[in-house]
Regions:
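Short glycine-/aliphatic-rich beta-strand segments at the starts of folded cytosolic domains
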Residues: 1-7
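Intrinsically disordered, low-complexity segments enriched in Ser/Pro/Gly/Ala and basic residues
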Residues: 2, 17, 30-31, 48
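Exposed, low-complexity/repetitive linear segments and helix-based recognition motifs
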Residues: 7, 26, 72-74
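Short amphipathic alpha-helix segments
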Residues: 9-28
């Protein structure tokens, strides 16, 4: 089954948050920005602050976000940064 294409950063952010939720990654803060690379291409940058210390969870989240990048973004590249915050 083909997944719908993602055409804006807010929808992309929702997808990333749902992946974090699926793997029980505690999201403390999330920010995003869209960078226009040229006339046709954009970059979506999503920064997530978390108190998670489990590298296995990080790997799973990055892998799933990579799927979004490869399969579902027709005109943008996605960069997800997971930043561990000590509370």
């Amino acid at each position: 089954m083909a997944s719908a294409k993602i055409r804006n950063i807010e929808k992309c952010k929702e997808e990333v948050l749902s992946i974090c939720s699926e793997y029980q990654l505690n999201v403390l803060d999330i920010s995003s920005k869209e960078i226009q690379l040229d006339d046709l291409h954009k970059q979506y940058v999503i920064d997530i602050s978390t108190d998670c210390e489990d590298d296995d969870i990080y790997d799973k989240v990055y892998t799933r976000c990579g799927f979004i990048n490869e399969e579902r973004l027709p005109d943008a590249d996605l960069t997800v940064n997971l930043n561990e915050v000590n509370i």
